[in-house]
Amino acid sequence: MRRQDFNFELPEALIAQQPAKERTQSRLLVMNADGSVSDCHFPDILSYVNENDCLIFNNTKVIPARLFGQKLTGGKVELLIERVLDERRVLTHIRSSNAPKSGAKLRIEEAFDAEVLGREGALFEVQLSKDEAPELTALELIEAHGHMPLPPYIEREDQLEDKERYQTVYSEKPGAVAAPTAGLHFDNDLLDKIKAKGAAAGFVTLHVGAGTFKPVQVDDISEHVMHSEVIEVLPETVELIKQTRQKGGRVIAVGTTSVRCLESAASFSENGELAPYQGETDIFITPGYDFKVVDVLLTNFHLPESTLIMLVSALAGYDRTMQAYAHAVEQKYRFFSYGDAMLVHPPTSDS
């Protein structure tokens, strides 16, 4: 398939610049298995979750990964941390008039120092330190001084509210530079109501990198090279899904990152069945993919020609997906990270 097959017209006014007043006040477009669509509100998801289903959430925590500083020569720099390597080192994008060389010293947020150790492709390996507080780790320095890394299509400066709202209520493991946005719609009350219905909640971890916003640049999507991200699927999550299957329940992935975790872990196992996994994945899910774990997907609305709309098409079917997106535009759903959600049921064989 061609990249252009996944293009659609999106009025700029539909790109959400702020979150809804309350997490659950978003709208929900349901793609039903019979091919129809239903316009709902997010709390209506309760009526689509059955007893014995399990919802799999990504518990990554967004770090305030955007940092501003200057070179010793006075030139301005902007860092977007891609990955925390250890207690001192990070991999980061650096924006400046001239790329800093190995050994270059930077002063960050007028608070601590950074030294460029080397380069790995488009990324820089950088060591962070604070002379007056040498015990502080790189992550602690980032947490104390960084800015929330809002996506490029949110055209405003980050605000105090974003530290809470660009984060899921169940976030636990720091490391993402972008939120797993399907989870932003849940508050603790809704999670309790889902459990009260007899559905279970499980967790995986995928630290979303800035590569999630990288556009597909090749025409033939089979030639696209997917970015790599760190994931973890724990034994207790594998066991939960096994029990769900035994009870006749469905696996509902909350977000494309949860899909990529589960399908990667199954793909990497010897027999193609879900197994615990910790490592990296560059799985690229496109139409024609045979899903091994996920039955239903909850996701936000994605960018035209993005790898994420391709993933949705793989589960929902290409024509159904593009029709649903056209419906969402017509009905003025809000798009992207702070926008509305869609619940995707794959089509039945006769729909």
Curated annotation (Swiss-Prot):
Pathway recorded for this protein: tRNA modification; tRNA-queuosine biosynthesis
Record bears the keyword Cytoplasm: yes
Alphabetized InterPro entries for the sequence: QueA, QueA_dom1, QueA_dom2, QueA_sf
SUPFAM superfamilies: QueA-like
EC number(s) on file: 2.4.99.17
Primary residence: cytoplasm
Gene3D superfamilies the record matches: QueA-like (3.40.1780.10)
Protein's GO biological process: queuosine biosynthetic process; tRNA wobble guanine modification
Record-annotated membrane-spanning stretches: none
Gene Ontology molecular function, alphabetical: S-adenosylmethionine:tRNA ribosyltransferase-isomerase activity
Catalytic activity: 7-aminomethyl-7-carbaguanosine(34) in tRNA + S-adenosyl-L-methionine = epoxyqueuosine(34) in tRNA + adenine + L-methionine + 2 H(+)
Protein family (similarity comment): Belongs to the QueA family.
Purpose: Transfers and isomerizes the ribose moiety from AdoMet to the 7-aminomethyl group of 7-deazaguanine (preQ1-tRNA) to give epoxyqueuosine (oQ-tRNA).
Protein known as: S-adenosylmethionine:tRNA ribosyltransferase-isomerase
